[in-house]
């Protein structure tokens, strides 16, 4: 029989919130009896936007804003039905985007 595993990918703009959410997932799944690999930090994506400060002229005066997207990867190996049930009931922050692949 093929080994069942779940790959959970987390994305957030705040690294503190994503770390707290990853810790919640790891604690919940290990208490349910599944083996876990991670959380593995993936490269942070940085997007920079350049905006002209003045509404009319002075094009040389610009302001730069950046937005960083932090990512974490968690692999759940040796999956149990209890672990899947615990993951479904888990309440995470709305600031964290969760992608789950089987």
UniProtKB/Swiss-Prot annotation:
Domain of life, source organism: Bacteria
Keyword annotations from UniProtKB, A to Z: Ribonucleoprotein, Ribosomal protein
Biological process (GO), any one: translation
Database matches in Pfam families: Ribosomal_S10
InterPro entries named among the record's database cross-references: Ribosomal_uS10, Ribosomal_uS10_CS, Ribosomal_uS10_dom, Ribosomal_uS10_dom_sf
Stored SMART domains: Ribosomal_S10
GO cellular component, one term: ribosome
GO molecular function: structural constituent of ribosome; tRNA binding
Protein family (similarity comment): Belongs to the universal ribosomal protein uS10 family.
Protein task: Involved in the binding of tRNA to the ribosomes.
Subunit structure: Part of the 30S ribosomal subunit.
Record's protein name: Small ribosomal subunit protein uS10
Organism encoding this protein: Tropheryma whipplei (strain Twist)
Species classification: Bacteria, Bacillati, Actinomycetota, Actinomycetes, Micrococcales
């Amino acid at each position: 029989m093929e080994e069942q595993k779940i790959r959970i990918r987390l994305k957030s703009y705040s690294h503190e919130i994503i770390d707290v959410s990853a810790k919640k997932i790891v604690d919940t799944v290990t208490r349910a009896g599944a083996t876990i690999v991670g959380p593995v930090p993936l490269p942070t994506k940085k997007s920079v936007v350049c905006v002209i400060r003045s509404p009319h002229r002075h094009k040389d005066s610009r302001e730069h804003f950046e937005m960083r997207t932090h990512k974490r990867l968690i692999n759940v190996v040796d999956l149990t039905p209890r672990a899947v049930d615990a993951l479904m009931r888990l309440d995470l922050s709305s600031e964290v985007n969760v992608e789950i692949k089987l």
